[in-house]
UniProtKB/Swiss-Prot annotation:
Its main location: membrane. HAMAP family: NhaA. It catalyses: Na(+)(in) + 2 H(+)(out) = Na(+)(out) + 2 H(+)(in). This is Na(+)/H(+) antiporter NhaA 2. Residues 432-486 are annotated as: Disordered. InterPro entries: Na/H_antiporter_dom_sf, NhaA. Keywords: Antiport, Cell membrane, Ion transport, Membrane, Sodium, Sodium transport, Transmembrane, Transmembrane helix, Transport. It holds the Pfam family Na_H_antiport_1. The keyword Electron transport does not apply. Belongs to the NhaA Na(+)/H(+) (TC 2.A.33) antiporter family. The chain crosses the membrane at residues 58-78, 102-122, 138-158, 168-188, 198-218, 220-240, 260-280, 300-320, 338-358, 374-394, 404-424.
Length: 486
């Protein structure tokens, strides 16, 4: 009698161990290294880019460049002014680029790239973000309106009888996004998350107001022919975006032509960056992993933080900090008006604008934000650095007045940063905004228990959540009481 065949056992798979390849040793990167996941291949590169995109990093790099410029200008002023006054003219005279200097290229060309990113952010906020909903946008817009009107009126009241004041009232209307968000991030995770949203919307609206001032009020005669050329080129760029012509070989020459046309038209060419940024799509197509605006923001963020803003700070902050210069800020009407407008005007105007919008039932305070938080918000808005320095160069005709106003901007911004950080870390500002231990994410009160704010999968990428609510927390039930107590 034959025995039944044995049952087949489990199939054993042979595990092949692949030797890790270290660059510079053995065969070098080959086909096995190409099979590594994308995150393993570019972890260092992506991590460094994310480090540069962080708000704290941008603020610290901007601060380091400012300190370097001050040290350079106060220890070797001759060398500083010689370097940045180096002639760097380019092209024929009819392009109006032949008389430019090195500092002009930084303020006009490099800052145009930064304002292109501002245009991308503004387009996203107007379409998908805080400014897309009327009630959500009303609070930061009203706060920004008050924060622009009060500083302008204070500065105008202190300088309207001063000869050479020009358009000095326009200098303290702007808020520096990089510095303000950097100072806010230094306050730690106990600050209410809604305060950052309001500050971002306020800074974007402030920048929009500063851009309109530059475009409409601070130009020196407009050439209609060049303006028509720039308008035609912008229309061509809009058509290219609409037809999905995304090649850099098309868009880079178009952007350069728009910049040259606006510069020749008499409008500050940084407006070209904002206009081009507003034309980029913020909604991805079905076959695109992300929108073009999101991709450009991700690529340009590290360049802005590491190159453009520090270079502008290095070229524009070379002011004297001698006792005579600091005394000049307190005695000169223009410098005093700029400093008072930034520090006191923002502190009064931002809370007043927000209060008026809430009282008129046009807006409401975000969750977790109380009236006491509007005081540090007004102080953060008083950090007017990048755009204020740019407006100073355009608003004041006298170089001596430009140096005095730049010193006033620096002094007021440092004072506003210190006061805002102190106010944000005070117990009054952090009441009602507890933080989770060991985590940098803000916390919220859920049923009287502090816990991290739930995030959906797409929230971490900055995208919409699709209206999905987070899953309810699992509640652990207590075991039933024993019928036979001991």
């Amino acid at each position: 009698m034959s025995q039944p065949p044995p049952e087949p056992g489990p199939v054993r798979r042979r595990t092949v161990r692949r030797r890790a390849i270290v660059p510079g040793q053995g065969r070098g990167p080959g086909r096995w290294s190409q099979r590594l996941p994308r995150g393993a291949r570019g972890a260092d590169r992506d991590g460094f880019a994310a480090f540069l995109r962080a708000e704290t990093t941008g603020g610290l790099l901007l601060l380091a460049a400012t300190v370097a410029a001050l040290v350079w200008a106060n220890t070797a002023p001759g060398t500083y002014h010689t370097v940045w006054s180096t002639p760097a003219g380019l092209g024929p005279s009819w392009l109006h680029l032949a008389d430019m200097h090195l500092t002009d290229w930084v303020a006009d060309a490099l800052l145009a790239v930064f304002f292109f990113t501002v245009g991308l952010e503004l387009k996203r906020e107007l379409t998908l973000g805080t400014l897309a909903d009327r009630r959500s946008a009303a609070l930061p817009v009203a706060a920004a309106a008050g924060g622009m009107l009060a500083p302008a009126l204070l500065c105008l009241a202190l300088t309207h009888h001063t000869p050479g004041a020009g358009h000095a009232w326009a200098i303290p209307v702007a808020t520096d996004i990089a510095f303000a968000l950097g100072v806010l991030s230094l306050a730690g995770p106990r600050v209410p998350p809604g305060l950052r949203t309001v500050l971002l919307g306020l800074a974007v609206a402030d920048d929009l107001g500063g851009i309109l001032l530059i475009a409409l009020g601070l130009n020196h005669g407009i050439n209609p022919a060049w303006l028509a050329t720039a308008t035609t080129l912008l229309a061509t760029t809009a058509l290219a975006h609409h037809r999905r012509w995304t090649s850099p070989l098309l868009h880079l020459p178009l952007a350069a032509a728009v910049w040259i046309s606006l510069h020749a038209a008499g409008i500050h060419p940084t407006v070209a960056g904002v206009a081009l940024g507003l034309l980029v799509r913020v909604h991805p197509d079905p076959d695109e992993p992300e929108a073009p605006a999101t991709r450009l923001e991700r690529h340009l963020g590290p360049i802005n933080a590491a190159v453009i803003l520090p270079a502008f700070a290095l070229s524009a902050t070379g002011v004297s900090l001698t006792p005579h210069a600091l005394l000049h800020v307190a005695t000169d009407p223009i410098s005093r008006g700029v400093a008072v407008g930034l520090l006191a005007g923002k502190l009064l105007g931002v809370p007043a604008g927000a209060w008026l919008a809430v009282r008129l039932h046009l807006a409401r305070l975000p969750d977790g934000v109380r009236w006491r938080h509007l005081v540090p918000l007004g102080l953060l808005a008083g950090i007017g650095y990048t755009v204020s320095l740019l407006i100073t160069r355009l608003a004041l005709p006298d170089p001596t007045a430009v140096d005095g106003a730049s010193t006033a901007i620096l002094t007021a911004s440092v004072a506003a940063s210190a006061l805002a950080l102190t106010a944000l870390r005070s117990p009054l500002a952090t009441v009602g905004a507890p933080a989770t231990r060991g985590s940098s994410r803000p916390a919220t009160q859920v049923g009287g228990v502090a816990g991290p704010i739930p995030q959906t999968r797409r929230e971490s990428d900055g995208g919409p959540t699709g209206g999905q609510e987070p899953p309810p927390a699992r509640v652990r039930r207590a075991p039933p009481a024993s019928p036979h107590p001991r």
